[in-house]
Amino acid sequence: MTTSTPDIQPAVQHTAQVAIAGAGPVGLMMANYLGQMGISVLLVEKLDTLIDYPRAIGIDDESLRAMQAVGLVNDVLPHTTPWHAMRFLTPKGRCFADIQPMTDEFGWSRRNAFIQPQVDAVMYHGLQRFPQVRCLFSREVEAFSQNGDGVTLNLKGPDGERETVRADWLVACDGGASFIRRTLNVPFEGKTAPNQWIVIDIANDPLATPHVYLCCDPVRPYVSAALPHGVRRFEFMVMPGETEAQLSEPHNMRRLLSKVLPDPDRVELIRQRVYTHNARLAERFRIDRVLLAGDAAHIMPVWQGQGYNSGMRDAFNLAWKLALVVNGKAGEALLDSYQQERRDHAKAMIDLSVTAGHVLAPPKRWQGAVRDGLSWLLNYLPPVKRYFLEMRFKPMPQYREGALLIDAAGKTSPVGKMFIQPQVTLESGESVLLDEVIGANFAIIGWGCNPQWGLDAGQIARWRAIGVRFIQVVPAVQIHREQDNAPGTLRVGDTQNRLKSWFAQHNTAIAVVRPDRFVAALAIPQTLGAQLTALAEKMTLATGDTARTEEKVA
């Protein structure tokens, strides 16, 4: 595919293995992971700095696990509020749906409030760890072309000067209005909500109550959310005929805030903005050497806080695959699994977000009355109440095709689902989360057995070439028994008995876990060799002889 290019000869030419368009959260996460794996990256952003105003306010356990994988979670956590409940209220203030999951199966609180600009800044500063990763601001992509060898981008710099970038691959993280997606003529079908919302952020929280509340007022629905560092967010529906300029006038701002505050004049306004809620999904996520991620691939209403988190899932899913391909350790066909695995789940999250929006602001007033009455009755049924409290309605990613081996158990199988992350005990006696042992790698995790047993030297070399960690899990009381140590296998103690319970529940002994923490295959010691051979073929892995064995971790 070729686009028109300016006739002016560029003064500056850049090269990189991967070019990323857009320094938002998805582009920053991609750059951090690829940098960690030794890939040269050029990140280009048309703005002159990172966006400094709050947008997303919810980060989930899967996204925190991605932050952990790139070594940034400890810097991110101070900008979060864990265990952040979401409560739907009737116009009279009665809570009819309380979403307050207390599970930590993936190592972190499932629902967390956060300040996005500060977390974005953490990811941006994280790039300084990698000398081969560069970020160029004030660079607009004017045109690009691709062939079988790579992608060429034509950039316009801050003073109008022309620059070119030559990269093996391009990841488009350039937002919902993606120039790259539009240039490639990829359909972006869906709907735009008829009503806009005005978002008001206030410092020194004048309300200071915890959690987030969605008030289903038929006159003007609104949201009230407590955020870290003393920030309060209010969101009000913009009614027909109202404009951002009108609502931003002092007397109208006072009128809005009087619904939620006893003294709307005593506030420290940070900013206000009007947003439109869209629900759209790209028809394709990969177009030859160009890959779409984040809002460039899908956009959704904010009501479940999943736009940001869906973008993080894209980055975590795509980055490790792209690293393998760029480093010559897997064939390009592995990248086809990105769309296979991510598109259906992104659509499910869009549908959930649209439904939540209809609960908050039903299109018809009578639907609100039915909602209130039905929810009041259902809350007296313990299973229904737990369904909301534990956030079981959230579609958890479960891949049924892609870079994995589906087994006969089908939907009940853990293959294609995220592996748990409990605390484990090291041989030193230290207690850590499991991912700290795995690192940014594949892991072959066996309960009570050495997962290398039964594998031939060629298989071990092939998987070590892509950085696999062989891990043996034992009861914590056995961790100091040196006679059980096997060369090349890490041993951890099952501190909380959760790993034993997981393997028992699924009637298996060994799990092959991908770098994005999804289970790729199951086995017992006698079948692991055959499973690894089949999985390597499915992922088009290079053989142990041809793969570059050095592990590039900054």
Curated annotation (Swiss-Prot):
Disulfide bonds: none annotated. Its cofactor is FAD. FAD binds at residues 17-46, 285-295. GO terms for molecular function: 3-(3-hydroxyphenyl)propionate hydroxylase activity; FAD binding. It catalyses: 3-(3-hydroxyphenyl)propanoate + NADH + O2 + H(+) = 3-(2,3-dihydroxyphenyl)propanoate + NAD(+) + H2O; (2E)-3-(3-hydroxyphenyl)prop-2-enoate + NADH + O2 + H(+) = (2E)-3-(2,3-dihydroxyphenyl)prop-2-enoate + NAD(+) + H2O. Gene3D superfamilies: 3.30.70.2450, FAD/NAD(P)-binding domain. Pathway: Aromatic compound metabolism; 3-phenylpropanoate degradation. InterPro entries: 3-HPP/3HCI_hydroxylase, FAD-bd, FAD/NAD-bd_sf, PheA/TfdB_FAD_monoxygenase. This is 3-(3-hydroxy-phenyl)propionate/3-hydroxycinnamic acid hydroxylase. It comes from Klebsiella pneumoniae (strain 342).
